């Protein structure tokens, strides 16, 4: 009887070990493409994203989460570092697309600071990748509760790029 007890105990432990090993699995999700950052030190990941050519040259790279959108405006697709807060050709903004009384934040000439780095532009696959960080100023100077917003550790990775479509052939 004691032998049966020890056998059952070993059998029980073996079943538990097998069950635990079988229930462990790796759920690896690759986040490709991606547009994410820390917004005021809180993780922020876009649900939708795009990169589009603009009529005067350059590109808009944007990521949206619900009604909130981050837009990076760059004068070219050249892989390099673009400094924000110097001019209006290179700018970053954050806003709520549908809110009437929500603040809108932007960088521009002598306004805000930061940088956008294009690390890769793959013309064959039509994707763009890079990093960003910026502090954008509230466009409503009277809003003392929300003077600025800061995005750090920002990454856009393999965002689909749409070139400017010319309908005049």
Predicted features, each with a name:
Residues 9-14:
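Sec-dependent signal peptide recognition
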Residues 121-169:
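C-terminal or internal capping secondary-structure element at the end of a domain, subdomain, or sheet
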Residues 35-39, 43-47, 52-127, 137-139:
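Surface-exposed helix/loop patches within compact recognition domains
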Residues 20-23:
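C-terminal motif of bacterial Sec signal peptides marking the signal peptidase cleavage site
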Residues 32:
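Acidic, metal-coordinating catalytic segment for phosphate/diphosphate chemistry
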Residues 25-27:
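Bacterial signal peptide processing site
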Residues 1-7:
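Short, Lys/Arg-enriched N-terminal segments with co-localized hydrophobic residues
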